[in-house]
């Protein structure tokens, strides 16, 4: 019985990690990385600009602490680059028409503008309190 539990736990661990793995081409070879590993390795973004990445990370960090280091921007960027039918982003389930990138980019631009109007600086330069006040 303990052997069965061990196999089950190993299978569960494998499925959990492989579901979040993303494929990157590095030096002509495909690498499977988690969003956190992709962020740590500073993998280039395919869709989002540097400003969009910094805005997304700070907003997400205000909502879900730890999301920046977990690689939220790498995950979103990777999903935006996927075929719409393969994307795991909520826009797909809310009836948005593909491509999804403009929807996310317009939202990030609006968030950036709101921070500039209210605090006279980009969202990525706001204090934690200021950032949370815009999210609340």
Please annotate each region the language model reported.
Residues 3, 7-13, 26-62:
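C-terminal segment of N-terminal export signals and the immediately downstream linker at the start
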Residues 18-26:
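Sec-dependent signal peptide hydrophobic core
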Residues 42-45, 53-56, 60-136:
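Flexible, low-complexity segments enriched for small/polar residues
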């Amino acid at each position: 019985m303990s052997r069965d539990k061990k196999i089950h736990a190993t299978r569960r661990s494998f499925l959990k990690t492989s579901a979040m793995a993303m494929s990157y081409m590095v030096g002509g070879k495909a690498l499977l990385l988690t969003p956190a590993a992709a962020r740590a390795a500073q993998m280039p973004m395919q869709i989002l600009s540097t400003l969009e990445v910094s805005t997304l990370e700070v907003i997400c960090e205000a909502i879900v602490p730890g999301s920046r280091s977990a690689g939220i921007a790498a995950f979103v960027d990777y999903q935006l680059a996927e075929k719409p039918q393969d994307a795991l982003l909520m826009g797909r389930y809310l009836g948005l028409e593909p491509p999804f990138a403009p929807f996310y980019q317009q939202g990030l631009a609006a968030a950036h503008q709101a921070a500039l109007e209210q605090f006279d600086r980009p969202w990525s330069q706001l204090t934690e309190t200021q950032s949370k006040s815009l999210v609340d």
